[in-house]
């Protein structure tokens, strides 16, 4: 189970809307309490691909985020990105690029701007997708 603060959800949502029509992206990190992962920090990164169909994180920003995680003793949990025109589920490309089965992938759908949908996923080595429980509080 993943827990995300409402304020951090709002940061992700605002960043995604600001970057429309392109996909937005970032990283998530936090602390573990048994099987629970508490997201303590979201990182808002530049999508250097500048497209609405896929993303690549700015490598300098990505490195700075990882350094910040280490400095603050946070565990890297995975990444997040938006789908401006498609549902909150991993695309075939998302599955193909999911190289680490131990991390979580958060996808924010903006298909309906009045009802954005954020979901968390696990993608295993065989590219099977399961929904991870995500609590926003």
Which residue stretches match the model-derived regions?
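Conserved beta-strand-loop surface patch within small alpha/beta domains used
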Residues: 1-76, 85-137
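Conserved, mostly hydrophobic/aromatic
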Residues: 79
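Short, well-ordered beta-to-alpha junction loops that form the rim of enzyme active sites
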Residues: 82
């Amino acid at each position: 189970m993943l827990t995300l603060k409402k304020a951090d959800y709002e940061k992700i949502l605002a960043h995604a809307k600001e970057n429309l029509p392109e996909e937005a992206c970032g990283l998530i990190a936090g602390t573990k309490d048994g099987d629970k992962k508490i997201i303590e920090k979201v990182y808002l990164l530049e999508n250097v691909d500048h497209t609405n169909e896929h993303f690549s994180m700015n490598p300098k920003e990505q490195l700075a985020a990882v350094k910040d995680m280490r400095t603050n003793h946070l565990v890297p949990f995975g990444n997040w990105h938006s789908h401006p025109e498609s549902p909150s589920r991993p695309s075939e490309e998302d599955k193909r690029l999911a190289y680490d089965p131990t991390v979580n992938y958060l996808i924010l759908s903006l298909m309906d701007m009045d009802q954005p949908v954020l979901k968390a996923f696990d993608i295993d080595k065989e590219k099977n997708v399961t929904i991870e429980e995500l609590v926003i509080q």
